[in-house]
Design a protein with these regions (language model features):
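Negatively charged, low-complexity tracts enriched in Asp/Glu with abundant Ser/Thr
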Residues: 1-29
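Compositionally biased, intrinsically disordered low-complexity segments
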Residues: 21-22, 37, 66
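Intrinsically disordered, low-complexity segments enriched in small/polar residues
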Residues: 13-15, 40, 62
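Intrinsically disordered, low-complexity regions
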Residues: 16-18, 43, 55, 65
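A short, structured beta-strand/loop element
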Residues: 28-59
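Mixed-charge, Lys/Arg-enriched low-complexity segments
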Residues: 2-3, 7-10, 52-90
Length: 90
């Protein structure tokens, strides 16, 4: 469960906007996170990332099978994020 507030701003080279929703789970090693990025131009993107000791980690997202249930539980609190993720498996 993330302690970071949403929405909060982000600024990338190709656009800026807000992190509209976020689902994460704390593990012994890092905090796997899925974010809904809502750009100022109205477009939306998913970001699969991780945090380490509270800081954004520049590494690929790796989620152990034993943490998927907890991450799924957190995703239930983020309806827009779930809607986009369903497009990956439907």
């Amino acid at each position: 469960m993330s302690l970071r507030k949403v929405p909060r701003p982000f600024d990338l080279h190709w656009g800026k906007g807000v992190i509209a929703e976020e689902a994460s789970v704390v593990t012994p090693f890092h905090e796997p996170t899925i974010q809904l990025l809502a750009f100022d131009d109205g477009s939306k993107s998913l970001r699969f990332c991780a945090y380490h000791k509270g800081s954004f980690a520049r590494m690929p997202l790796i989620v152990g099978e034993e943490h998927l249930k907890a991450l799924a539980k957190e995703l239930k609190k983020s309806p827009q994020l779930r809607k986009l993720l369903k497009k990956l498996v439907d």
